[in-house]
Amino acid sequence: MHHFYDQLCPSCAALNYTKRSELADMSGMVVLLTGGRVKIGYQAGIKLLRCGAKLIVATRFARDAAERYAAEPDFADWGDRLEIFGLDLRHIPSVEAFCTHLLKTRTRLDAIVNNACQTVRRPPGFYEHMMNRETAALELLPANVLQLVGSYETLRSVAPSRPLGEDGIVAPKLPAAEAINVPGLTRAAELSQTALLPEDHLTAASLFPAGQLDQDLQQLDLRGRNSWRLRLHEVSAVELLETQLVNAVAPFVLNARLKPLMEATPGVHKHVVNVSAVEGQFYRLRKTTKHPHTNMAKAALNMMTRTSATDYHDSGINMNSVDTGWVSDEDPVAIAEAKIAEQRFHPPLDIVDGAARIVDPIIDGLNTGTHVWGQFLKDYTSTDW
């Protein structure tokens, strides 16, 4: 048995363990990463920064993300190459505005990693504990946190104008009229508190106990049932649409609108990574009857890759879908804990493994000179769609 993995064969274990720490020289390259605040996305962000890349992270909770990155022991080595923007991918006009901002202020973009996804929908109470931080006056923020969100705060007209670190271009503020129309960009965190369904009014401390966080330092969610267990007739229209927007529509917009910026970046090393899952795979022998809406969204994302990879490859952009592997248990806490107690269950991989997989097309391509494209990648190799 491998010293780290207890559910992988020896050769797979050796490969996965090597990939966990593999880096490449990405000096001077710029990467956009969505969903880079926690779990796989956060670990992917750290890996890219340690490769030397300049990283733009998009997340609903920019200040919380900044605190997490700033707490890393080697923050001083790469903190000046990280920018964090607040963005709610459920609001597509805001995604369009964010793309416009990047097109106006950036001179290159080497990779897009569409990592953000909505698998289990959480009510506002799940995020409430972060709101004081996300709405606090700027002068209350630590200097290292303000450093990371400075461009974002300028964009949404909260902070004084300040130059971007890349080339001295002064970050523009959004016109007041436009700022009102793109709350997913200017008030990304606050939108999480908008109640759209009856269950969104659940604020009981018994469900979201104050001060209790899970292993990913997220609010503990003690609801007895969540999205992962829903069947077709149980999924609300709101959840269906949100899942499609975050998992498929927003990546579509980012890939489409930012293509000119990637085309203006010289080289054939460029990548678009659409983070997918086997739930979106048609050639899979067994399917459960649960979470059809998330399956649909990942299938749609895969079809974007399948359709557009050739077109993007003609511009030196290598587009792939990548499965993260089984790294987490999405079941409600009570069910997950029962499986641990009764079956000693745990996923075969962890979030570092998942992060290594989604950035591997970039890192492996740079290290080997062979950039794969047009593939659905699982376990570091091509698999069926």
Spans of features found by a protein language model:
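C-terminal helical subdomain
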Residues: 156-157, 162-207, 338-385
